[in-house]
């Protein structure tokens, strides 16, 4: 069947001879539609309901076919609210999957799951569209080169470095700083690497989406005066959206990123906040489609759905997609099927700790729980590897001694253990860092610390050269020279108080 390029609906192609059906049943966001015999739409085809409700308001709902039920009926999931729909309304089969605009015209704009701009800046001037359901790159096209992606955040670059073109998970419960860390990464990467980013807001708070947009405009990541010079495209399917939209918005963002990689041959950063909400939406849809729930009430197709998204995030010989995904951990339980399934796909994990956050150490990245497949001497070099291992050993010994300290006090420790504890506390504080995106709240200017500077700083602490400096001097500073300067300032303040 031929497609009509002059579609009245952005990102969705319609066919010359309309294939129409009628709504048979509506259960929340799920529609059953009856089509004429022999005219059933394919799985993943987009269906459109265009009508008027009882108050004579325009209805324009796009759905996606999920199941073929028999008796010429299909079951589809709506991408927007189904308010006003009634049985018997006409449904048009577009003859194609959902397609979204791609290319340079998407930068600086905010889209919904259908690829429609929602920022009141007018239509998107893009002739190119891609379907959101695409195959993962063929094995022969993949690029297997290993290299580090420098973020400018000390704890990440030293202890759990990110792979260029890899997948990174940010794990943490509610309110420990996942979204702030993502905003800092977007800021640092846009400024230090000049990379193009795509941000997929999957099932998170609308307020956070708005805050992120405003923050990006302030920092220049989105250029209001010349929108084409922006470094990021935003795709939002927030908490108030139906589960169908939240389940597919990650694919919309990924499709836009794939265009930059495959056609523009660029290195792209794909941020997904939050991948757990993608699983959660899939769970809601699965129940509505009548599938039997699996472990902890999740959908039986959890691994398949996650795999179909994650396998498309890959580096090819044309370009790369480096993906950073925030993962909400329900009740801080890392064995929950949603975070556990996500773990299998990741090259690095950045685990955020509530204990560190309660101490006021930000970013609250747990240095012992965070891991990376890149932390090997043949990839990062011996100096980096040995420094990271010594930092971890010192922090691990401090963790083991904490029970003894709590019961008997520091005085009962050996001289060597006391020294280890003192250095570990300095390391713990030096792993904190002022963020550019938090300047407004803290009043401290943000700091970007290069990898070489980070390694030098921790080597100086481990060597004992800075044993004479107070712990507080290492808290919320950039490189090690700032810690030395802060120590002098603290000493002068103490003298003036006396």
From Swiss-Prot:
Produces ATP from ADP in the presence of a proton gradient across the membrane. The catalytic sites are hosted primarily by the beta subunits. This is ATP synthase subunit beta, chloroplastic. It is an enzyme of class 7 (translocase). HAMAP family: ATP_synth_beta_bact. Keywords: ATP synthesis, ATP-binding, CF(1), Chloroplast, Hydrogen ion transport, Ion transport, Membrane, Nucleotide-binding, Plastid, Thylakoid, Translocase, Transport. ATP binds at residues 172-179. GO terms for molecular function: ATP binding; ATP hydrolysis activity; proton-transporting ATP synthase activity, rotational mechanism. F-type ATPases have 2 components, CF(1) - the catalytic core - and CF(0) - the membrane proton channel. CF(1) has five subunits: alpha(3), beta(3), gamma(1), delta(1), epsilon(1). CF(0) has four main subunits: a(1), b(1), b'(1) and c(9-12). It is found in: Plastid, Chloroplast thylakoid membrane. Its EC number is 7.1.2.2. SUPFAM superfamilies: C-terminal domain of alpha and beta subunits of F1 ATP synthase, N-terminal domain of alpha and beta subunits of F1 ATP synthase, P-loop containing nucleoside triphosphate hydrolases.
């Amino acid at each position: 069947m031929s497609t009509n390029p002059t579609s009245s609906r952005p990102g969705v192609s319609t066919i010359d001879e309309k294939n129409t059906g009628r709504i048979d049943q509506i259960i929340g966001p799920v529609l059953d539609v009856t089509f004429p015999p022999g005219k059933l739409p394919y799985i993943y085809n987009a269906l459109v309901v265009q009508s008027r409700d009882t108050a004579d308001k325009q209805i324009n709902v796009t759905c996606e076919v999920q199941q073929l039920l028999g008796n010429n009926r299909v079951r589809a999931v709506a991408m927007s609210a189904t308010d006003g729909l009634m049985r018997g309304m006409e449904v048009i089969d577009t003859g194609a999957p959902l397609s979204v605009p791609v290319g340079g015209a998407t930068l600086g704009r905010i889209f919904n799951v259908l690829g429609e701009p929602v920022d009141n800046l007018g239509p998107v001037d893009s002739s190119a569209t891609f379907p959101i359901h695409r195959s993962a790159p063929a094995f022969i096209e993949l690029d297997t080169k290993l290299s580090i992606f420098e973020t400018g955040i000390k704890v990440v670059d030293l202890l759990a470095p990110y792979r260029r073109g890899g997948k990174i998970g940010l794990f943490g419960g509610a309110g420990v700083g996942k979204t702030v860390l993502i905003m800092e990464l977007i800021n640092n990467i846009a400024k230090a690497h000049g990379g193009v980013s795509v941000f997929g807001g999957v099932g998170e708070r609308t307020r956070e989406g708005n805050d992120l947009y405003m923050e990006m405009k302030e920092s220049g990541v989105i250029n209001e005066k010349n929108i084409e010079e922006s470094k990021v495209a935003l795709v939002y399917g927030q908490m108030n959206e139906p589960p169908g939209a939240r389940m597919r918005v990650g694919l919309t963002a990924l499709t836009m990123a794939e265009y930059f990689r495959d056609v523009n041959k660029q290195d792209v950063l794909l941020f997904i906040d939050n991948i757990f909400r993608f699983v959660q939406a899939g769970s809601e849809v699965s129940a509505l489609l009548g599938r039997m729930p699996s472990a902890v009430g999740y959908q039986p197709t959890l691994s398949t759905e996650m795999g179909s998204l994650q396998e498309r995030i890959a580096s090819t010989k044309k370009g790369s997609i480096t993906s950073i995904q925030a993962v909400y951990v329900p009740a801080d339980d890392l064995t929950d099927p949603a975070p556990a399934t996500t773990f299998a796909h990741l090259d690095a994990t950045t685990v955020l700790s509530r204990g560190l956050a309660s101490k006021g150490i930000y970013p609250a990245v747990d240095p012992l729980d965070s891991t990376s497949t890149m932390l090997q001497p043949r990839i990062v070099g011996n100096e980096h590897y040995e420094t990271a291992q010594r930092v971890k050993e010192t922090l691990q010994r401090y963790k083991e001694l904490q029970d003894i300290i709590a019961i008997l006090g520091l005085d009962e420790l050996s001289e060597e253990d006391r020294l280890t504890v003192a250095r570990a506390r300095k390391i713990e504080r030096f792993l904190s860092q002022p963020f550019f995106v938090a300047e407004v709240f803290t009043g401290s200017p943000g700091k970007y610390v290069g990898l070489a500077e980070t390694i030098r700083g921790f080597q100086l602490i481990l060597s004992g050269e800075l044993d004479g400096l107070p712990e507080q001097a290492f808290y919320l500073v950039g490189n090690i020279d700032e810690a030395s300067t802060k120590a002098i300032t603290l000493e002068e303040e103490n003298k003036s108080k006396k």
